[in-house]
């Protein structure tokens, strides 16, 4: 039985965001790097998982720790601090699941580089966007604030020629923040992703999201979309957020907000399937929440892991309330 009886509605949605992000990462790890044809030849249709995820969840939970340690005001330096103090999570047993340029950036921190310098030379990745869900929870109901904080945090690993990855992080964070608004729908949270991105500097990512969502809505079905997307929107680096973020948002649309459908569709999408699933599952979890119906779906996760994610959700919700109270108090003081 899921440990949800005592949770508030907000806490249930935050828990679902984290739990389904983990499921998306774990299920997608089976098909990561594969194209759809190879997935079908090897597995048929993927709809099961084992394990607790890869680098996506590790980096996400390090960011959550940074937010908790700073009462919700984490910046790029604070995330870097968690990379250093918990470096065994990056360089440990799952180090082979990290993209090389991120391991290189983390190694720079170990060698006393300033955090603001480690992004130099990094390749395009989804490291910040795949990890950004806690920012959406802490800024729940305020997509603009979520986008601003996500942009700052993403600058740890994405600057200059790959700064568009900041836009990807802003899009995912604002989408999750918008999912906690009363009356939120699939369409409203997807619109939040577009609205979060600067229309001038972020024009490339913004346009890609708009175009890919239009393709999803006009496609006959998921497989037709998948074929068209992989013909026109794939990048040389499969973890490039210009590919993964629009794809994840399209998975949200095809799943109509159902987190299980989102992670299954993501796993069968191929390419950077675990990262796409982590983002899509997190968004849909935040939108839909969690109930007893999810027990069987989440059963492959170890009980200890589920409890850890539950406590993490509770901590992030508490930080949200604390931060919101502090912001209200600050804005109420004026001469």
Regions found by a protein language model. Give the residues of each.
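Structured, active/binding-site neighborhoods that engage oxygen-rich ligands
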Residues: 1-335
């Amino acid at each position: 039985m899921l440990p949800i009886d005592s949770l508030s509605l907000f806490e249930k949605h935050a828990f679902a965001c984290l739990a389904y992000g983990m499921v998306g990462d774990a299920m997608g790890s089976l098909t990561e790097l594969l194209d759809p044809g190879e997935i079908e030849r090897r597995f048929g249709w993927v709809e099961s998982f084992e394990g607790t995820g890869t680098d996506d969840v590790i980096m996400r939970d390090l960011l959550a720790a940074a937010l908790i340690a700073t009462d919700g005001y984490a910046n790029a330096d604070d995330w870097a601090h968690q990379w250093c103090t918990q470096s065994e999570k990056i360089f440990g047993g799952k180090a082979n699941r990290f993209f090389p340029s991120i391991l290189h950036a983390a190694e720079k921190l170990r060698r006393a580089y300033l955090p603001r310098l480690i992004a130099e030379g990094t390749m395009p990745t989804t490291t910040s966007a795949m990890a950004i869900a806690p920012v959406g929870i802490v800024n729940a109901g305020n997509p603009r604030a979520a986008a601003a904080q996500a942009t700052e945090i993403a600058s740890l690993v994405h600057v200059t020629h790959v700064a568009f990855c900041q836009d990807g992080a802003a899009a995912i964070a604002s989408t999750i923040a918008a999912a906690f608004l009363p009356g939120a729908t699939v369409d409203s949270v997807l619109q939040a992703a577009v609205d979060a991105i600067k229309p001038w500097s972020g024009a490339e990512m913004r346009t890609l999201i708009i175009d890919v969502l239009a393709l999803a809505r006009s496609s006959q079905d998921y497989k037709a979309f998948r074929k068209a997307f992989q013909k026109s929107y794939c990048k040389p680096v499969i973890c490039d957020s210009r590919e993964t973020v629009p794809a994840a948002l399209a998975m949200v649309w095809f799943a109509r907000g159902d987190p299980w459908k989102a992670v299954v569709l993501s796993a069968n999408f191929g390419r950077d399937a675990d990262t796409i699933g982590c983002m899509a599952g997190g968004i849909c979890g935040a939108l839909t929440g969690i109930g007893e119906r999810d027990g069987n779906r989440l059963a492959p996760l170890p009980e200890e892991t589920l409890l850890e994610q539950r406590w993490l959700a509770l901590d992030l919700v508490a930080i949200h309330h604390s931060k919101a109270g502090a912001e209200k108090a600050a804005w109420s003081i004026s001469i």
